[in-house]
Amino acid sequence: MNYYEEIKNKLVDNEITKKIKDYSKNKSDLDTYYYVGKMLSEAGKHYGEGIIKEYSNKLTYDLNKKYSVRTLYNMRLYFEKICCNEKLQPVAAILSWSHYCELLRINNMHEILYYINICKQYNLSKRELITKIKNKEYERLPKESKLKL
């Protein structure tokens, strides 16, 4: 399997889909980033961690668009942290990609689930989510409330 060609083709397909179906942009993005994250996770197991940097350079050159190491790393984290987690999987497509990029910095899965749920419940913007994370809202919850999540 040629991981690079698979990733490149998926990203090109995603760019086409974005132009045709703007209304489903977020779903298309998350599906694509899930797939690319999965491919990067598998490629990393075969070729090592440096593959993300290599693919970033190649994708930026081939597609004339900036696919930074950080962006590709976030795609892999989205797949590994969110989509592969049984508790988080059912809610994986609820938020925008920018929301997930903020949540990927959190290591505690219960905390991520808490923030996903409040974003959904209160329709929080990315900026509002960042404020709640900076204010450590989850950490200030009583222990009993955390256990119910």
Predicted regions and their residues:
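Basic, low-complexity intrinsically disordered segments
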Residues: 1-149
